[in-house]
């Protein structure tokens, strides 16, 4: 029998339903794997007692025939999601030991459907980063290594703990958040599937805010079908989030395996950028061939404002972050550093409580929102954002069903390799992903191959608003044609 932790979420669901094993047995297997994988630093908090209690409840419900769609399935939760009575810090020192008295809407949906909480997963501080190196708990180490090289690699960010945990078989699936690529980029770096749904598809209530007009929750999974199962549970209308859209959630699982014959797939010429590696270019061409062989029509398209997306994003996102993070003052919750008066206390608390990357983004955001520069930077960036959205609207109006692009400009890089370099070099990791957030569209990253030195490479599919089903159908075609890419050597177990 396949090791319990190696089962896909879909296989685990079937095994539980058929009584082949219990949720307690499955949960214990994951808890043991988590214990052996602490060198990866994927979890910032393990919750074994809660997990086993939830698993026992699931087993009772399974025995009585009252099962939910995720009954008994052990999941990891990114530390950006508030979990009632369970420490939630956004991996920031300023929120050290914060224990929320409420549950995020997304996680409450997962518990409603029977899922089991294994623990809280590491991420970049306040989700600001592309490598999971800015966390107050230290960097996450990718379960992947280059062939013949023991250099520790980043799992991507900001949802690096989620990606690493799913890839290393430390949970059956995980939640992530995506503001500029924080689900899709780590998914591509770790050989996992990650989807950022349409803005408004999942509630943001109870998720620590980074950039409110860009943030969106989504799942990580080992297969396209598993991601579809998770998104169905996570999504849904929530009156507590004014940006959450009141429309029915489709059965995404039904879309997996559906025919893509006649679907029109756009290849944007602007994404062929200077310095893009030959292997990424070849992977992109092969991905288009996979879709064409399955009956899709491949067409060249133009998204002319793509070149302005990254600079516009790095104005809009820090501006919103500086506003959202103004609430962390040391008075109401979290870390507090004393001062002679209230102003000095604020200054000391924020200087000590925020890491360098978060401080950088707050300063950029405050600068671009200042009276003298608002029109020159922030207002202009918002105009560019409108033009990016218009580019996609025009392409979709021409009958294009989805857009195929690379997910990242390179495979994973070494820990420390880019963190100390020019920050712009790190920001360039998001070059293929930020347009999706700026336009509020759904995007999925799916593993499509391995680099010359044996690291995962992913492709990205971008869809029309609220047409995630199309993305699942197309991603499954790539998954079937390219194969899956599990981590083959579990070096962290010694």
Swiss-Prot record:
Pfam families per record: Amidase
Subunit text: Heterotrimer of A, B and C subunits.
Molecular function terms, GO-annotated: ATP binding; glutaminyl-tRNA synthase (glutamine-hydrolyzing) activity
Reaction catalysis annotation: L-glutamyl-tRNA(Gln) + L-glutamine + ATP + H2O = L-glutaminyl-tRNA(Gln) + L-glutamate + ADP + phosphate + H(+)
Keyword Transport: no
Functional summary from the UniProt entry: Allows the formation of correctly charged Gln-tRNA(Gln) through the transamidation of misacylated Glu-tRNA(Gln) in organisms which lack glutaminyl-tRNA synthetase. The reaction takes place in the presence of glutamine and ATP through an activated gamma-phospho-Glu-tRNA(Gln).
UniProt-annotated catalytic positions: 78, 158, 182
Classification via InterPro entries: Amidase, Amidase_CS, Amidase_dom, AS_sf, GatA
Example GO biological process: translation
Entries under NCBIfam families matching the protein: gatA (TIGR00132)
Protein name: Glutamyl-tRNA(Gln) amidotransferase subunit A
EC number: 6.3.5.7
GO terms under cellular component: glutamyl-tRNA(Gln) amidotransferase complex
UniProt keyword terms in alphabetical order: ATP-binding, Ligase, Nucleotide-binding, Protein biosynthesis
Recorded superkingdom: Bacteria
Family assignment from sequence similarity: Belongs to the amidase family. GatA subfamily.
Keyword 4Fe-4S belongs to the record: no
PANTHER family: GLUTAMYL-TRNA(GLN) AMIDOTRANSFERASE SUBUNIT A, TRANSAMIDASE
């Amino acid at each position: 029998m396949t090791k319990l932790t190696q089962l896909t979420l879909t296989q685990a669901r079937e095994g539980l339903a058929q009584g082949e094993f219990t949720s307690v047995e499955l949960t214990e297997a994951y808890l043991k794997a988590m214990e052996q994988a602490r060198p990866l630093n994927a979890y910032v908090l393990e919750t074994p007692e809660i997990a086993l209690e939830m698993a026992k409840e699931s087993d009772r419900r399974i025995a009585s025939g009252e099962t939910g769609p995720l009954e008994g399935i052990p999941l990891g939760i990114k530390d950006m999601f508030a979990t009632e009575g369970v420490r939630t810090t956004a991996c920031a020192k300023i929120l050290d030991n914060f224990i929320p008295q409420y549950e995020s809407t997304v996680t409450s949906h997962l518990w409603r459907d029977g899922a089991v909480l294994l623990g809280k997963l590491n991420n970049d501080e306040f989700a600001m980063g592309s490598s999971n190196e800015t966390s107050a708990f230290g960097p996450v180490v990718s379960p992947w290594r280059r062939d013949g090289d023991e250099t520790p690699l980043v799992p991507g960010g900001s949802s690096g703990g989620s990606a690493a945990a799913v890839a290393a078989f430390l949970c059956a699936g995980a939640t992530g958040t995506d503001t500029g690529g924080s689900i899709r980029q780590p998914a591509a770096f770790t050989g996992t599937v990650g989807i950022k749904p349409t803005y408004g598809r999942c509630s943001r209530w109870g998720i620590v805010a980074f950039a409110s007009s860009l943030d969106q929750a989504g799942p990580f999974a080992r297969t396209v079908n598993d991601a579809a199962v998770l998104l169905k549970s996570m999504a849904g209308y929530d009156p507590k989030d004014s940006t959450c859209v009141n429309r029915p959630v489709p059965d995404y699982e039904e879309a997996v395996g559906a025919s893509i014959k006649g679907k029109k797939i756009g290849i944007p010429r602007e994404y062929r950028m200077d310095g893009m590696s030959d292997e990424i270019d070849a992977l992109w061409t092969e991905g288009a061939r996979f879709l064409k062989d399955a009956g899709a029509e491949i067409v060249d398209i133009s998204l002319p404002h793509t070149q302005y997306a990254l600079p516009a994003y790095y104005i809009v996102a820090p501006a919103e972050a500086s506003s959202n993070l103004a609430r962390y003052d040391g008075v109401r919750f979290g870390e507090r550093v004393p001062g002679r008066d209230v102003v000095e206390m604020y200054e000391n608390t924020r200087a000590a409580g925020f890491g360098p990357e978060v401080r950088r983004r707050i300063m950029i955001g405050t600068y671009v929102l200042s009276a003298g520069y608002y029109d020159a930077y922030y207002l202009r960036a918002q105009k560019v954002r409108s033009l990016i959205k218009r580019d996609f609207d025009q392409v979709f109006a021409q009958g294009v069903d989805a857009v195929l692009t690379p997910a990242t400009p390179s495979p994973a890089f070494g820990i420390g390799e880019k963190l100390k370099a020019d920050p712009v070099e790190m920001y360039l990791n998001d070059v293929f992903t930020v347009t999706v957030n700026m336009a509020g569209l759904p995007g999925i990253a799916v593993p499509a191959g391995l680099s010359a030195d044996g690291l995962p490479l992913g492709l990205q599919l971008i869809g029309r608003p609220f047409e995630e089903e199309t993305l699942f159908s197309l991603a499954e075609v790539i998954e079937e044609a390219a194969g899956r890419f599990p981590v083959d050597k579990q070096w962290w177990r010694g």
